[in-house]
């Protein structure tokens, strides 16, 4: 019944799924964590399969110093399902990025409940480090993570 809109700069808004709605609600604001020039920014959002019960949602964003991809879990505030708790961030994985482009960003839950993360090759024209073919790096891969394990951190 709701529509969530991500902005590359690091904000997520929520709207009621009604054509007459004219107001937006800030669901999450992590602009202070996100670098958002070029192909970087807040790049993905996925809701846990048990979201209605646990309020968990996941985001993929690029962070500065050092430049890296971050996939984190957040939770909605206990008193309002239209507001994410910025202080609830639990970082699942961080991967350094050698360049400012080709960072990937898509995240989605599969039918078995695992979180799939599309990692770009780390960038620049022609993949100069050959990350897309290098089996020793997580760049240029699709990661599959069971976020319900005890550690749920890599």
Annotate the PLM regions:
Residues 1-126:
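Acidic, Gly/Ser/Thr-rich repeat motifs that build Ca2+-stabilized beta-propeller blades
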Residues 70-80, 130-148:
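Beta-propeller blade signature
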Residues 109-116, 145-154:
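Secondary-structure boundary elements
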